[in-house]
Amino acid sequence: MIIGLTGGIASGKSTVVEIIKDAGYKVIDADQLVHDMQVKGGRLYQALLDWLGDGILLPNGELNRPKLGQLIFSSEEMRYQSAEIQGKIIREELAAKRDCLAKEEDVFFMDIPLLFENDYQDWFDQIWLVAVSPQVQGQRLMKRNHLSAEEAGMRIASQMPLAEKLPYASLVIDNNGNIDDLKKKVKGAIKDLANLV
């Protein structure tokens, strides 16, 4: 059984991943995979360099991630181009990791932030969605990423609205409360999962 885990930016998904890992389940992290491929010499690093030129690099040759983020989130056209350029490479690499882990584990998770936006739904037996109100999401994003309200709003607006994701979720994990509430909900879901398998 493969479970897709998703949620909007600053929804608390990373905390959910830690709880799942603590329960002994393996989690493929799409963000980490992207990060690894964006290091100097990686597949995405080269694709981004070919697209945007060396203005996105730091003096040491590494990607200037804040500048890259600002560029990509600056317009819908840039986001679309980024998805086109990086999407195919990311899908290939995630599929390879998924197929490899499926040989070793009966049940595992894949943490994919843009699961619905990039049409990964058919990869999964279940989809767990971490949900948070736009107000809480905005506050957390501004605090975590040191963004202005406008920048946070642009990033949130670039993702599919929560209401459109809800019908596709097997499980919705409400994370508008505190960390203890979240742990209780996730541990309950994991217990239910263990009874299913």
Swiss-Prot record:
InterPro entries: Depp_CoAkinase, P-loop_NTPase. GO terms for cellular component: cytoplasm. It comes from the Bacteria. The keyword Coiled coil does not apply. Residues 2-197 form the DPCK domain. ATP binds at residues 10-15. The keyword Ligase does not apply. Gene3D superfamilies: P-loop containing nucleotide triphosphate hydrolases (3.40.50.300). This is Dephospho-CoA kinase. It comes from Streptococcus thermophilus (strain ATCC BAA-250 / LMG 18311). The gene is coaE.
